[in-house]
């Protein structure tokens, strides 16, 4: 059995709560950031220059986070999220456009490397609720305009010069209000590893954007994506080579005229889309259902749910236990 702690914190701008998060996670993040040696990471000057060139509106937030981290050179470079070590998050995601809309996704990762932090903030005046990574990066999230985003590893090996996708998603939620604006950001900002980004706004406008360091971003109207960047592609990493199967199962549910949003969410909680974290030391750590019209997030596990939102955000903590024989809880009701 594996236990994973989820915490929800609310901090309008970076302050003591994020400072404590920095202090708690820095030893592990420092080891991760230096795993290829310090020379493999960009200098402070380069990190600052790239932020100023590509994500200038984030500079004040970055500077405040660096201050909270003690002002160290290494901490500043890490927090820029420019050219960090490559990381892989399995993931499956779908866009629901009927009587919704909704963005549903599974986040698949190693429990020991997962922050488990749900963060409500308004760093630059726009309220956001996100699943956080690397202190201020975004795995998935929603902002007060109803724009929802999520990521999945693209399944390709090339690594280049660019930002972690998580800080680019932070930028999108801070400064974009609709899908077209988010797409423009993904087209212009360099990304260091290939990722598939699902976008949805409250009017149902949507896109799946395939970003990579070695080719231009490609925008598609796809409703389902996992860990490949073309319909006939085979992921490079063996841990995500079931991408086609997961996509097919989710697509079949989306295409079923008798299925609603509740049935779609249940598909994400069922194998093969759901993957047991006990089996290989990594797996599905949560299912997220973002509801742009409500500006809300419904986190689901096989034995429970935690509802969050831009309004009525609940701070607190929950321990989620993953057991190999874990039964489903009764299905949550979605309108």
Task: Indicate residue ranges for each PLM-predicted region.
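C-terminal, well-structured catalytic/ligand-binding subdomain of enzymes
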Residues: 1-71, 81, 98-335
